[in-house]
């Protein structure tokens, strides 16, 4: 079993402090997450056998982000790139590395060797957003991807909901019967509590 790398709590706090949770920062975070999820879906539709759990997670994330983008007021999109600050770039790089680690831990394969940007080079202009991402904002993109086809193959007819039954109560003579060890221990604990 492949183990994951643990991050220190202080590293997580520093990253959270750098994130901007204003409406614009939150929207850029959601857009970065949506772009990464779409990339993962497109890569996973390749020649290897897809993992159902992975597709369910990605599909649910995409649906939540799409619903959030529909509910949010649509601001006029400037012709400038979506990622303007180094915080957005480092956030998307962090999310991308986490998802790659998740892939390797689930698949058991070696991660692709992508060069990690050193801290000194983060001041450079981040890459332009993919046109695929802008296309993903339209509601028909997710409908064309065929993600729902994965769930049609699941046979749920054998799974019937049974009425919830109360768990059977154990016989009272087995637990805390007078004279048993547990009963004496409980009496002793109560004497200590009441005596203090």
Curated annotation (Swiss-Prot):
InterPro entries: SERTA_dom (IPR009263), SERTAD3 (IPR039585). Keywords: Activator, Nucleus, Transcription, Transcription regulation. The lineage of its organism: Eukaryota, Metazoa, Chordata, Craniata, Vertebrata. Antiviral interferon-stimulated protein that plays a role in innate immunity and in the suppression of viruses through different mechanisms. Plays a role in the late phase response of TLR-induced immune effector expression. During influenza infection, interacts with PB2, PB1, and PA to disrupt the formation of the viral RdRp complex. Inhibits zika virus by interacting with the capsid protein in the nucleolus and reducing its abundance through proteasomal degradation. Strong transcriptional coactivator. Pfam families: SERTA. This is SERTA domain-containing protein 3. Residues 1-21, 104-125 are annotated as: Disordered. Residues 26-73 form the SERTA domain. GO terms for cellular component: nucleus. Transmembrane segments: none annotated. Interacts with RPA2. (Microbial infection) Interacts with influenza virus PA, PB1 and PB2,leading to inhibition of RdRp complex assembly.
